[in-house]
């Protein structure tokens, strides 16, 4: 009996595993979401060496966006600052400003680093937000105490996986 239970557990566990490869949602509609952010993309632009990168996945079926934001050189050592939030805006094309869609409170005193974040559940995208987001009309900023409207900006681009 003990052997039978162990075999049953192994069979169930093996059946739950995937082969790896491309991630997929319930029906396979998953998008890669990427962006390269700089201070030059802000409107109006500011002159800094700050950069950031956005790398994520959006599952259209579950309406979940998971992502990692990596940033560097947000400030000089002599002018320390603090990240206060990550803000999503839309609809707007590159070179234009949009309305605030989501503000995620996030605090870091590191001028370089990364964070794994997400939008899901109650904070998932509404239908109009989803339309704008999927058409590339969203951008994000990293806001700090000194740069309350953003020190870097990056337009979010989607491509189906």
Predicted regions, residues:
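Sec-dependent bacterial lipoprotein signal peptides
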Residues: 1-17
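Metal-centered catalytic cores of metalloenzymes
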Residues: 17-86, 90-161
